[in-house]
Amino acid sequence: MRGIDKFKERFAGHDGEYVLIGGACDLLFGEAGQDFRATKDLDLVLLVEALTPEFGQVFWDFVREGGYENRQKSSGKPQFYRFSRPEDPAFPAMLELFARTDVSLRDAESGLMPIHIDDEVSSLSAILLDEDYYRLLVENRASAGGVAVLSVEGLIPFKAKAWLDLSARRAGGQAVDEKSVKKHRNDVCRLATLLAGGERPAMSEGVRADMRRFLEAYESDPVDLCFVKITFQ
């Protein structure tokens, strides 16, 4: 994954202040000796309640060192930042940050510009504002490749929820990319192959209800396992 080594090096010691979501599958499957869909961006959820001033300094140093040309920020909540087109190819092609509340990641020289929120970002933002899912994220952190990521047990309900949300938007007439919708359902199936069988992560009743809705929908339209390249050992 492009830039992951540079990210791991610079953010060492700050793994209690963020959780990697976008890019987590790549790392988790890599540790299992399997390939995953190529990921060009790193999506981070900032744990605002644990953030330190040092993290903000490390982050802006990272942005400056990478020479990110595009620096953008959304309005409203949750806060969303996007940094892309780094001058240094050793850095991630894109960094996306989510924070449920205001964070002190301000820099007078950053030149942040407004950003258009697409369906993927809007869906994840809505999920992160849900207290049940945020608690699920905080309680299901893991380490993969030396980076703090959302665990397999946490990613499955997150992706199931994203599929439900995007499917509902598409059914309601919104112009949602069908590939984005199917991607999350296929990812749930692939992630399930990494489960050892005895995991029972704590879930709120709301998250359990969403998982039941996902499974009911899946039973009526199952995934072609060959298409998602699931292998059995």
What does each of the following model-derived ranges do?
Residues 1-233:
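Compositionally biased terminal segments of proteins
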